């Protein structure tokens, strides 16, 4: 679904160098550029429903990718013996329990994703 969304939005919104790279190398435009193109097109009434759906898929993929990165950082902090209190302070969380809850949620999110985001990228 993510790859199909990237392809659709590249075909619809690539221009300039991005269009040349798509036509010659089938290089997809970056996800955030694609999403911004859709929001701009929607604001001017030019976006189609399929464009909006594809952009939403990419937003979800980006969110998952960031959650997986955050989980890796929590794991690295744990490996360095960084205390939950310190993590909570950095993240502006109320307490160590909140940091531990966040880490558990991220671990569950990683498990739901299968641990390997595969085609995820931002």
Residue locations for each model-derived region?
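Short, Lys/Arg-enriched anionic-surface-contact patches
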Residues: 46-70
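Alpha-helix initiation and N-capping motif
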Residues: 32, 49-52, 96
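Short alpha-helical "packing" element that flanks the helix-turn-helix/winged-helix DNA-binding module
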Residues: 73-74
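Short, Lys/Arg-rich amphipathic alpha-helical interaction segments
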Residues: 83-122
């Amino acid at each position: 679904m993510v790859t199909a969304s990237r392809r659709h939005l590249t075909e619809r919104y690539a221009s300039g160098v991005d269009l040349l790279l798509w036509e010659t190398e089938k290089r997809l435009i970056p996800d955030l550029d694609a999403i911004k193109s859709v929001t701009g097109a929607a604001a001017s009434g030019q976006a189609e429903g399929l464009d909006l759906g594809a952009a939403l898929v990419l937003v979800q993929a980006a969110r998952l990718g960031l959650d997986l990165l955050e989980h890796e950082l929590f794991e690295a902090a744990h490996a360095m013996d960084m205390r939950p209190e310190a993590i909570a302070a950095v993240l502006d969380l109320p307490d160590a329990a909140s940091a531990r809850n966040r880490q558990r949620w991220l671990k569950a999110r990683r498990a739901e994703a299968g641990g390997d985001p595969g085609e995820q990228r931002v």
